[in-house]
Regions:
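Short, flexible, surface-exposed loop segments at domain boundaries
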Residues: 2-43, 48-140
């Protein structure tokens, strides 16, 4: 009887202790500020679960153009995968994250194409001119 009651309590309480992680994806130039990895002024966390592609390592991240994938847990952005990108290939971006205040990951648009997605967390494909996004559309 005690075992089944404990198992039942565990099944009831277990979901309360779990947190939902939301995946993100962004492209941008990294910087280090006071020991914190930043992209567009937003902090990201590198930890023992972060994987670096090809030749890239943590020491290379200052000023490098990268694609980052990760999860947001309890408001903290954990990087899970980092890949260096060729600066010549940055005319298009695939982004996944929140559209808030006409921005996604700190990027604004030149054509207001983020407006239909305001308040949503989604995957987008956008053109990029080196400063601003344009022609953003939901990724298929």
């Amino acid at each position: 009887m005690k075992k089944s009651l404990c198992a039942l309590l565990l099944l009831i309480l277990l979901p309360l202790g779990t947190t939902q992680a939301t995946e993100f994806k962004l492209t941008g130039r990294t910087t280090w500020q006071l020991g914190q990895l930043m992209v567009n002024g937003m902090p990201f966390v590198i930890d023992d679960q972060t994987r670096f592609k090809d030749w890239l390592n943590e020491d290379d991240l200052g000023g490098t153009w990268v694609e980052m994938k990760g999860v947001v847990e309890n408001g903290v952005r954990y990087v899970r995968k980092v890949e260096a990108l060729d600066e010549d290939d940055k005319d298009e971006m695939d982004l996944e994250g929140p559209v808030e205040g006409g921005r996604i990951w700190g990027y604004t648009t030149s054509d207001n194409s983020l407006a239909p997605f305001e308040g949503r967390w989604l995957e987008l494909e956008c053109k990029f001119d080196g400063m601003r996004l344009s022609r953003c559309r939901e990724d298929d």
